[in-house]
Regions:
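Short, Lys/Arg-enriched N-terminal segments with co-localized hydrophobic residues
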Residues: 2-19
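Mixed-charge interfacial surface used for oligomerization/domain docking
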Residues: 17, 23, 29-43, 48-50, ...
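N-terminal glycine-rich anion-binding loop in soluble enzyme alpha/beta folds
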Residues: 23-81
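Class I S-adenosyl-L-methionine
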Residues: 55-125
Length: 305
């Protein structure tokens, strides 16, 4: 079931008719499922995983439940990126029925898939037909870009205009994440074993942020309760500093522990009483690096086109 506001989805799905037939394409890092993609009329490439030496694709033969069962059971889980062949095959298929493709992968700072797609789009057979947007976003903010692109295509904007808008708008988003365990940051090399051990002994909860490109450290807290409040406070500060006024959306996002996430959702709603707070799960590729029990709050400026 789609979790975005009915007003936004109505705009995305029904308004206007494009002069060009433009396809919108993304990957499952956006949190968009195959069912949601079909409902929206877009294309979503599943991200590949290797679990104990076996290959899987997110939302194809790898469910959230199966993924967390393996991850929490100690399986060796690795993320990967779609092959050039898979991307090229999908582009070729789409271009048989469309004039252009807007391709919105996850941030180039978090995966090589964006750079690979950008190099492919520069080849003669795709130049001027495939527009790869490095939106420097992931999860709900990447999904917001997809919905903006779809709405613009349905309003009649050209592929170049959509690409330019998304590129210029990429920094109008903010995400803060806190993790329940440091184990997965250590496994992924984002935290040294010594630092992870010390932080664990001190019961420190790190807060991470995505402000364009990479996942970076923002701060630390001694309790999850304080970390939750710090994230909300900083999102509010970012909204104020960037002058968004009331022209923004807020989201509460989580990995695995829905009960804790629903509790945090109420806290986010209290902090933003005039907003319809979006509630969503983190994509598996993000969860793989930060682990189950993670909570995040995000905000992004509403589309203006």
């Amino acid at each position: 079931m789609l979790i975005y506001s009915s007003k936004l989805l109505k705009l995305s799905l029904t308004e206007g008719g494009p002069c060009m037939k433009i396809a919108i394409m993304t990957d499952s890092n956006s949190g968009i499922t195959q069912a949601e993609a079909k409902e929206l009329g877009i294309y979503c490439i599943p991200m590949p995983f290797t679990i104990d030496g076996k290959e899987f694709e997110e939302d194809i033969n790898l469910t959230q439940e199966h993924f967390y069962e393996k991850l929490m059971g100690g399986a060796e889980v690795f993320t990967s990126q779609p092959t050039i062949g898979i991307i090229a095959k999908k582009w070729d298929e789409i271009l048989k029925t469309h004039d252009a493709i807007i391709h919105i992968p996850m941030s180039s700072g978090l995966s090589g898939s964006c750079q690979t797609a950008m190099m492919m789009a520069d080849e003669d057979q795709y130049k001027g037909k495939v527009f790869v947007v490095d939106s420097q976003r992931i999860s709900v903010t990447q999904k917001a870009d997809v919905l903006d692109a779809l709405a613009m295509a349905n309003k009649g904007y050209s592929a170049q205009e959509i690409y330019d808008y998304l590129t210029n708008n990429k920094m109008n988003a903010t995400i803060y994440v806190t993790v329940d365990t440091l184990e997965y940051l250590k496994k992924g090399g984002r935290l040294s074993p010594a630092a992870a051990t010390l932080a664990g002994l001190l019961k420190i909860k790190p807060i991470l942020t995505i402000q364009g490109e990479k996942l970076d450290k923002y701060g630390t807290s001694r309790t999850m309760k304080k970390a939750r409040k710090m994230m909300i406070d900083q999102v509010k500060q970012d909204i104020s500093d960037r002058g968004w006024g009331d022209d923004y959306e807020v989201a509460c996002v989580y990995s695995y522990d829905k009960e804790a996430a629903l509790d945090y959702l109420e806290q986010v709603k209290e902090a933003f009483p005039d907003k319809e707070v979006i509630f969503d799960r983190l994509s598996l590729s993000v969860a793989c690096h930060i682990g189950p029990g993670s909570l995040a709050v995000a905000a992004y400026k509403k589309g203006s086109y």
